[in-house]
Every structure is written in structure tokens, then in C-alpha cells.
């Protein structure tokens, strides 16, 4: 047997198949290196070497992952398909084994030695060929998957080696067995191996036929699914598997015993298990019962997490991850203290209410961490179906427990911190009211025996620390709101945001963008400018996005320009994040008649709000512009009526309403405005315009007015004071009843403001109006 060396033949690794000599077949080629190997072969003599991978899951096999014996092959035809792959028609020529691998830039070639075989045959070869044909004929008759034409073509083959290869290619052999035949160079050995493989396949087919006949006798013709299951039974019987469900039932029994269920739940589980054992596996009810038992054993009936009762450590963890939010932190530490003393306190039900981005969800995670408990979160936004909370009854196809029970299974503990995110976004429709279903979950007197429609057994939720989050408390139904302890989280002040950026957000973004602390420095004034002019929010989400934009610019400068340190100041800030997006109200530059600076409270914090009054000849018509809401319009009417009733005391012409039309305008007319807190501001502007006395530019005011001139309390004084301080005002006139709210204002802001607390409009006018009547 002589061998011939061929050098630098492009290599095409095959996955899950191989090619014997004289075989002609199509191949679809898509891997880049394989495509390049084909291109190289087509540019030269159209010859390529096909070798099979040992593991089909590998995309780029190495030398040790390819069988060394393959087929020296000629490419007959090549076609590029629209999807980028290539379809080739190849013809196997000779066996060969790899001598050396040659790695090129985008493909691999090999040096191979052709394995020549003797085509002559002796009497033993003739006998083996006849035996092979006889067994192949029997195999075809049993399998009925190979055509008579194929058998006829095989009988015409004269070469014994070629006959063995062709027959082997038609057998459903494992890849390693086909490779074994390819590697067998001796023709007699190859014929014997193929005969052995055929005999083995015949035995397998006979057993399959026997199983099929046994099943067919015991089934109805129309029950196709039943036939398949009976066939599986027959296979198990043939293998001697008589165990059935016994082992499975034993395992489930042990799980039920170890689950720590209450006695009544355990009794139900064992009863269902008894039903499961008796019902055939082919029954649809069988899988329903099994799924139910799996849920029962997976729930944490008694398994609890031991609380970390170290108040100092818990406080440190909360302070480390969140700036401010003192009320929430204090409430958690109070809970821990009582838990340490009593050892058996029911979990509180808290609702963190506040605008987006102030850290409600992340605070809940920190609370779980400080307590050492598991954390579970479910989003209730858009939930409309009561079954989402309580689950579906098992009579429905595909029934599942509700989100509460699913969350408890996920936690794996009886006392997790359970976050009910966006509880104010639930709504109801024809499928029920999920907020009503939440009443039982969030009632400390009832949730120790919570009942899910799917589980149908009571489950104790009393040890769970439920934390709900909401943006708008007004959309939460009253009974549900009454069950929760509301903790309002106001927006952060500029100073708080500055500290959050320096302590939390900036270090986080620097790390996420692959920078070092020494690479990027933001000056405090630059951070304040970002807060004031590039974000308008109560929280810090947009602020974090702007910091991320700065970090990206810095990363580009460091990589592309090889700079070591980037410093961002208020002067070069626009180079990083562009022009300013927002502007806040500013104090007036001079005292003016009929122009008063009011204070407004929005969802993104406090701001100033100018109110202008103009007189024009007319018949006392009151004109209101600036996209004012109904409440604000009524405040203007009340202020107007009060001024008309007090003309003598205020030094105004009694018949002014017969001479002038009065126009009250609030600038930024595209922005909707509403609320009663601009009452004293409008009244002051009216008096200023009618008396000709200017209003101090340094004064901002807020308060509701009555027809008797009383000044009533308002909300959001803290945020309004922050807006006034930012705008450069020095004096704030506020209702006397809001005195208690002043202590909530940061000390750094209080120091720069003078607060005048008024209970009547006379006090407001005394401090707001300057100069003499004109």
C-alpha cells in the first residue's frame, strides 16, 4: 500500500457528517475560515481536504479537535446563496491522513498523505461482498427506509472497498462508527465491520418492530397520543423498568415531610399525592396535581432569616448607600429596636411616596441589606386583573399562583423585604380590582392567613416587611392607603444633590466607564450648573445621565487624545454636554408696580412665578391669562372681590371697577398653572397696580387668601424656599400656620432668607409694598 504526499491542501472541517471516497453530495458552508478555504481551492486545482470535527459544538476547532483521517475531495460546483452561505457539490476521491497543519491568515491548509487501497479482489473478498449484500437486503426489507434503486446500485459495484463505503453511508450509524470505517484502510477489515454494524442495526429494528406490534394490539386506532405513551411503556417493559411512579412518589413524600407545612396543609398535600399516584401519567390531571404539589413543597412555610439587630451597623449601611431620607431611616431603626426588645413584631407596611428618581426602589433594597433579609420586587404598574395578585383557580388550564405567592417562592424565606413597586399604577377592569385584592395582603390583622386561589391553603404573610412605592397617593384607593404607613420622600435640594453626586453618582459613573478617580474632576460649581440648567427633576436620574455623558466625553479624550486628567468647570461645561436646557425664574432687577414674585411648587421642586397686573380704560372687566386652572382663577376672583370690598382702607378709588378693565397675567403661558397658593400674590399685585405703589423686588410670597383677607396655609414651603433662594430673593412672606414647616428647610438656605409670617393680607402689604402712592 503506497502513499503519496500532497502539500498545502485547504482544510474544510465538517460538523456531524463525513464523506467517503466516491461519494457525491452537497454541503452548505457558512463559517468564515471554511468559506476562505473553498475560495482558495477554487483559485487553484479545486481540490480540498474534508475532515470531521470530534465535537460539533465548536465553531473554530483546533488540531486536536479534528479527526486525522479524512477524504481528499474535488469540488464539482460552487454556488453562493443570498444568506451569505455557500453551497458546494463535492466528490470524494481518496482516503488520506493529515501530516501537518499550516495556519494562514484566514484559513487552514494541511499536508496529507493519500492512502491507496488495492482494488483487486480474491475469493474471500467475493464471499464478504455477497454476505454484505445479503444482510443489506434484509436490513432494507425491515427498515423500509432505503429504496430498491439504492440496493440495485450497490449490487453493481465491483470494488469491495467502495461497496463497504457506500453501504456504510446508508446506515444510521454514530459519527464515531462512521469515522472508524473511514479509518479502516484494509478492505477485508472494512467489509467485516460494515457487516457487524448491519447485523446490530437489524437487531435494533427487530426489537422496535416487536415493541410496535405489542402496543398496536392494545390501543384504539384513533388515539394517537395514547399509542405514543403505550409505546413508551412497552420500551420500559423491554428494558425491565417496572418501577413506575413508586420512586417519584417516595421522593415527593419526603419533600412534603421536610417542608415544614402546617398540619392542615400537609394533609392536603398527602391527599393530592395519593391521587397523583393512582392517576395514569397519560391523564392531563396528573400534570396538574404534580405542579400543585411542587408549589406546596417549594414555599417557605417556616424557614426564616435571622434579622441583623445591630442598630449602628444598620444605620451605617443606610447612610452609606443613601444621602438624606432621615425619616425613612429613622422608621427602620425604630422597627429594629422594637424587634430586638419584643422578638415577635409583625412586619410594618410602609409606603414610600415621592416623585420619580428620588431613590424609593433602591432604598428598599438597602433596607433589606441592612436587615440581612432576602429582597423580592414585583411591579404593579399596569396590573388590571385580580388574579395577578390572588392567582387562578386550578380548574383553569395553565393556572398559576398570584404574584405574592410567586414572590414568596422566589425569596425562599418567610420574612423577606417585599417591594410592591408602583402601587399607585394599578387599575381595574371587567376582570376585577387588584387593589381590592391587595387589601388582604396589606392588612396586618388578616395577612397571617392569606389565601391564594391556586394554593387554596392559608399562607402567613405577617412576618413579611412590605414596602410599597408610589408617585401619586391620590390614585391609591382610600381603604388601601389607610392600611399603609405613608412616608413622604420630597425631592432633593441642590445641596443634597451636590453631595449625592460627589459621594455616590460620580464615583459610580467613573467606575462604569473604566475611568480612574484621578482621570476626571468636576468642580462644585459645574455640578450645580448641571443641576440647575441641564436637569429639572426632584430626583437624580437625569442628573446621572448627564454625568454619564461627561464620563463618555472624558473617556474619549483620554483614549483618543491621550490626556491624563480632565477637569470640568462651569466655563467648559458646555463642551461636554452642550447648551443649557432649562432656566429657572430670577428675582426682578428693580421694584415695579403691578409685578409681584410668587412662589410655586411643582413635581420637580420649587420655582418663582411672576404675576403681572395691568389696568386699561374699561368697565371693570377681569381678564385672566397664562393658562390658569380653575382653582387659580377662583383665587384671582377672591383677591379681586377682597380689593373691591376694602377700597377705602387700601386707599383705592371706590369706583375703579367702573373706569378700568383689570388684566392679570402669569408669564410662560404655555405651561399649565393651578392651585390656591397664589392668592396673596394676586391680591398684592392688584393693590400695587391700583395704588401705584411698587413691590419690593427682594420679596417672594405664597399663601391662599379668603374674602375676609385671611392668609391660609399652603404646601411645599420647603421646595418654594429653595426656589426663592436659588432665584436670589432675600425675603419670603408665608402663612402664619406654616411656621412649623420652616424647620424642614435646610439650615444653609434658612440663613440666607428672612421669613415673614402673615395671618392677614394687611401684614403682607405692609412688608411687600414700598414707596408712596402715585
Swiss-Prot record:
| Binding residue positions for ATP | 354-361
The entry's cellular-component GO terms read: cytoplasm
Q: Which SUPFAM superfamilies match?
A: P-loop containing nucleoside triphosphate hydrolases (SSF52540), PUA domain-like (SSF88697), Ribosomal protein S5 domain 2-like (SSF54211)
| SMART domains on file | AAA, LON
The source organism is: Bacillus subtilis (strain 168)
- Cell compartments where the protein resides: Cytoplasm
Domain Lon proteolytic residue range list: 590-771
HAMAP family with a match to the protein in the record = lon_bact
Q: What is this protein called?
A: Lon protease 1
NCBIfam families documented for this protein: lon, PRK10787.1
Question: Transmembrane residues, as ranges?
Answer: none
Gene3D superfamilies linked to this entry? 1.10.8.60, 1.20.5.5270, 1.20.58.1480, 3.30.230.10, LON domain-like (2.30.130.40), P-loop containing nucleotide triphosphate hydrolases (3.40.50.300)
Give any GO molecular function from the UniProt entry.
ATP hydrolysis activity
Q: According to its UniProt entry, what is the function of this protein?
A: ATP-dependent serine protease that mediates the selective degradation of mutant and abnormal proteins as well as certain short-lived regulatory proteins. Required for cellular homeostasis and for survival from DNA damage and developmental changes induced by stress. Degrades polypeptides processively to yield small peptide fragments that are 5 to 10 amino acids long. Binds to DNA in a double-stranded, site-specific manner. Has been implicated in preventing sigma(G) activity under non-sporulation conditions.
Which residues of this protein are catalytic? 677, 720
EC number of this enzyme: 3.4.21.53
Every copy of the Lon N-terminal domain together lies at 9-202
Question: Would you identify the family this protein belongs to, as annotated?
Answer: Belongs to the peptidase S16 family.
Which gene name belongs to this protein? lon1
Question: What is its induction behaviour?
Answer: By heat shock.
Q: How does it assemble?
A: Homohexamer. Organized in a ring with a central cavity. Exists as a mixture of small oligomeric species in solution.
Query: Which reactions appear under catalytic activity for this entry?
Result: Hydrolysis of proteins in presence of ATP
Keywords assigned by UniProt, alphabetized: ATP-binding, Cytoplasm, Hydrolase, Nucleotide-binding, Protease, Serine protease, Stress response
**Which example biological process does GO assign this protein?**
cellular response to heat
Amino acid at each position: 500500500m503506497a502513499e503519496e504526499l500532497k502539500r498545502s491542501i485547504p482544510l474544510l472541517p465538517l460538523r456531524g457528517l463525513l464523506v467517503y471516497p466516491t461519494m457525491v453530495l452537497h454541503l452548505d458552508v457558512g463559517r468564515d475560515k471554511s468559506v476562505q478555504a473553498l475560495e482558495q481551492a477554487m483559485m487553484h486545482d479545486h481540490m480540498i481536504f474534508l475532515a470531521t470535527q470530534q465535537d460539533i459544538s465548536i465553531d473554530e476547532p483546533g488540531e486536536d479537535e479534528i479527526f486525522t483521517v479524512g477524504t481528499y475531495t474535488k469540488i464539482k460546483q460552487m454556488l453562493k446563496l443570498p444568506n451569505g452561505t455557500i453551497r458546494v457539490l463535492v466528490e470524494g476521491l481518496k482516503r488520506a491522513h493529515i501530516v501537518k497543519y499550516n495556519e494562514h491568515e484566514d484559513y487552514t491548509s494541511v499536508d496529507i498523505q493519500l492512502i491507496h487501497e488495492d482494488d483487486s479482489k480474491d475469493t474471500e473478498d467475493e464471499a464478504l461482498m455477497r454476505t454484505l449484500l445479503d444482510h443489506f437486503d434484509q436490513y432494507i426489507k425491515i427498515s423500509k427506509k432505503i429504496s430498491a434503486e439504492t440496493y440495485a446500485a450497490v449490487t453493481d459495484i465491483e470494488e469491495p472497498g467502495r461497496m463497504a463505503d457506500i453501504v456504510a453511508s446508508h446506515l444510521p450509524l454514530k459519527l464515531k462508527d462512521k469515522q472508524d470505517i473511514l479509518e479502516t484502510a484494509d478492505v477485508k477489515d472494512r467489509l467485516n465491520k460494515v457487516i457487524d454494524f448491519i447485523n446490530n442495526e437489524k437487531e435494533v429494528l427487530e426489537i422496535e418492530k416487536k415493541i410496535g406490534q405489542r402496543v398496536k394490539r392494545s390501543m384504539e386506532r384513533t388515539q394517537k397520543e395514547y399509542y405514543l405513551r403505550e409505546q413508551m411503556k412497552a420500551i420500559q417493559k423491554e428494558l425491565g423498568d417496572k418501577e413506575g411512579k413508586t420512586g417519584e412518589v417516595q421522593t415527593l413524600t419526603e419533600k412534603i415531610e421536610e417542608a415544614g407545612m402546617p398540619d392542615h396543609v400537609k394533609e392536603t398535600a398527602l391527599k393530592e399525592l395519593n391521587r397523583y399516584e393512582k392517576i395514569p401519567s397519560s391523564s392531563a390531571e396528573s400534570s396538574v396535581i404534580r405542579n400543585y404539589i411542587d408549589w406546596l413543597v417549594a414555599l417557605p412555610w417556616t424557614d426564616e432569616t435571622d434579622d441583623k439587630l445591630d442598630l449602628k451597623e444598620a444605620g451605617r449601611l443606610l447612610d452609606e448607600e443613601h444621602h438624606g431620607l432621615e425619616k425613612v431611616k429613622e422608621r427602620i431603626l425604630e422597627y429594629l429596636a422594637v424587634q430586638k426588645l419584643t422578638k415577635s413584631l409583625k412586619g410594618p407596611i410602609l409606603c414610600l411616596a415621592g416623585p420619580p428618581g428620588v431613590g424609593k426602589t433602591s432604598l428598599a433594597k438597602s433596607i433589606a441589606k441592612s436587615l440581612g433579609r432576602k429582597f423580592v420586587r414585583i411591579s404593579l404598574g399596569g396590573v388590571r386583573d385580580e388574579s395577578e395578585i390572588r392567582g387562578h383557580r386550578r380548574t383553569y388550564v395553565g393556572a398559576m399562583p398570584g404574584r405574592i405567592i410567586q414572590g414568596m417562592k422566589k425569596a425562599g424565606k418567610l420574612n423577606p423585604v417585599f417591594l410592591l413597586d408602583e402601587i399607585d399604577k394599578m387599575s381595574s377592569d371587567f376582570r376585577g380590582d387588584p387593589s381590592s385584592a391587595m387589601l388582604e395582603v396589606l392588612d396586618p390583622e388578616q395577612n397571617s392567613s392569606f389565601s391564594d386561589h391556586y394554593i387554596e391553603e392559608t399562607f402567613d404573610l405577617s412576618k413579611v416587611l412590605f414596602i410599597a412605592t408610589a408617585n401619586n397617593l391620590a390614585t391609591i384607593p382610600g381603604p388601601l392607603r389607610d392600611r399603609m404607613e405613608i412616608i413622604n420622600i420630597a425631592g432633593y435640594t441642590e445641596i443634597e444633590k451636590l453631595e449625592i453626586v460627589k459621594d455616590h453618582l460620580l464615583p459610580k459613573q467613573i467606575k462604569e466607564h473604566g475611568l480612574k478617580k484621578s482621570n476626571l474632576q468636576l468642580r462644585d460649581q459645574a455640578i450645580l450648573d448641571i443641576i440647575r440648567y441641564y436637569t429639572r427633576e426632584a430626583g437624580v436620574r437625569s442628573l446621572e445621565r448627564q454625568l454619564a455623558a461627561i464620563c463618555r466625553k472624558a473617556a474619549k479624550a483620554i483614549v483618543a487624545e491621550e490626556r491624563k486628567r480632565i477637569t470640568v468647570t462651569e466655563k467648559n461645561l458646555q463642551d461636554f454636554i452642550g447648551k443649557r436646557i432649562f432656566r429657572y425664574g430670577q428675582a426682578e432687577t428693580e421694584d415695579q408696580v403691578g409685578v409681584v414674585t410668587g412662589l410655586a411648587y411643582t413635581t420637580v421642586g420649587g420655582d418663582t412665578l411672576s404675576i403681572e397686573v395691568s389696568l386699561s380704560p374699561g368697565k371693570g372687566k377681569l381678564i385672566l391669562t397664562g393658562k390658569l386652572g380653575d382653582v387659580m382663577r377662583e383665587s384671582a376672583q377672591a383677591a379681586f372681590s377682597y380689593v373691591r370690598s376694602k377700597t377705602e382702607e387700601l386707599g383705592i378709588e371706590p369706583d375703579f371697577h367702573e373706569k378700568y378693565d383689570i388684566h392679570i397675567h402669569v408669564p410662560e403661558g404655555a405651561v399649565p398653572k393651578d392651585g390656591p397658593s397664589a392668592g396673596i400674590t394676586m391680591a398684592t399685585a392688584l393693590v400695587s397696580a391700583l395704588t401705584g405703589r411698587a413691590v419690593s423686588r427682594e420679596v417672594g410670597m405664597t399663601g391662599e387668601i379668603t374674602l375676609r383677607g385671611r392668609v391660609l396655609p399652603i404646601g411645599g414651603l420647603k421646595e418654594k424656599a429653595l426656589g426663592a433662594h436659588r432665584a436670589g430673593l432675600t425675603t419670603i412672606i408665608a402663612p402664619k400656620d406654616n411656621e412649623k414647616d420652616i424647620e424642614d428647610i435646610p439650615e444653609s438656605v434658612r440663613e440666607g432668607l428672612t421669613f415673614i409670617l402673615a395671618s392677614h393680607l394687611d401684614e403682607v402689604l405692609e412688608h411687600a409694598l414700598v414707596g408712596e402712592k402715585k
